[in-house]
UniProtKB/Swiss-Prot annotation:
One Pfam family this sequence matches: LYTB
The entry's keywords: 4Fe-4S, Iron, Iron-sulfur, Metal-binding
GO molecular function: 4 iron, 4 sulfur cluster binding; 4-hydroxy-3-methylbut-2-enyl diphosphate reductase activity; metal ion binding
Sequence positions that bind (2E)-4-hydroxy-3-methylbut-2-enyl diphosphate: H41, H74, H124
Entry similarity comment: Belongs to the IspH family.
UniProt binding sites for [4Fe-4S] cluster: C12, C96, C198
Annotated residues for binding of isopentenyl diphosphate: H41, H74, H124
Record protein name field: Putative 4-hydroxy-3-methylbut-2-enyl diphosphate reductase homolog
UniProt-annotated binding residues for dimethylallyl diphosphate: H41, H74, H124
Provenance organism: Buchnera aphidicola subsp. Baizongia pistaciae (strain Bp)
PANTHER family linked to this entry: 4-HYDROXY-3-METHYLBUT-2-ENYL DIPHOSPHATE REDUCTASE
Length: 221
């Protein structure tokens, strides 16, 4: 059997940072550290953290008052932060800086009466937090685009005050065909997606494509 290893692999910088934060929290306060979402898609690490005393809970109401709660790198809706204040829960914020950057951009454009076209997968935790940063009003709105089909059907009243952004971990193969359709339909629209790309995700997906070609090569010989 031939084993192929491709680079980059393992976790991104922000995932490593989140793991360091939760381990530091355990060292500082001991057991009963709550985390609102799985830090990493790795059951071995998650189970190991549970054994150390980390409690993963999406239900904010189940968290005891005056506890320690770590916000995972995916971010959380504002309503959760409000509840933590009411219950005097100490927050440890491990939100990915790139996710925060998208939140700030959407909040700023919202205040300045911009429409936002968000290319996304609405089931992802990152998006749940993002959507809450946008307050709909009579002057502007947020438009969710999940596919090329959604982009083709989309109608916007004022495209001059509109921007495109996207879930930072979506693949370029999914995003750019949608952006192409939107730019053709709405030439005045601003594409601000390039500054929000998670390059760790892109590099890993590129590596997977590269190694898949190697696998096909070896399987043919």
């Amino acid at each position: 059997m031939k084993i192929l290893l491709e680079n980059p692999r393992s976790f991104c910088v922000e995932t490593k940072r989140a793991l360091s934060i939760v381990n530091l929290a355990l060292k500082t306060w001991g057991k009963l550290i709550y985390v609102n979402h799985k830090i990493v898609h790795n059951n071995y690490i998650i189970n190991n953290l549970k054994l150390k005393g980390v409690i993963f809970s999406k239900n904010i109401n189940s968290i005891l008052e005056s506890s320690k709660l770590m916000l995972s790198k995916h971010s959380v809706p504002n309503k959760i932060k409000k509840t933590t204040l009411e219950k005097k829960i100490f927050i440890i914020d491990a939100t990915c800086p790139l996710v925060k950057k998208v939140h700030k951009k959407i909040h700023y454009k919202n205040k300045n009466t911009y429409n936002v076209i968000l290319i996304e997968n609405s089931q992802h935790p990152k998006i749940q937090g993002t959507l809450e940063r946008y307050q709909k009003n009579l002057k502007n709105s947020i438009y969710i685009v999940k596919s090329k089909k959604y982009a083709i059907k989309l109608t916007i009243k004022n495209t001059r005050n509109s921007i495109i952004t996207a879930q930072i971990t979506l693949s370029s193969e999914k995003i750019y065909p949608i952006i192409t359709i939107l730019r053709k339909k709405f030439p005045a629209i601003i594409n601000s997606h390039e500054n929000n790309i998670c390059y760790a995700t892109i590099n890993r997906k590129t590596a997977i494509k590269h190694i898949s070609k190697k696998i096909r090569h070896y399987s043919c010989h």
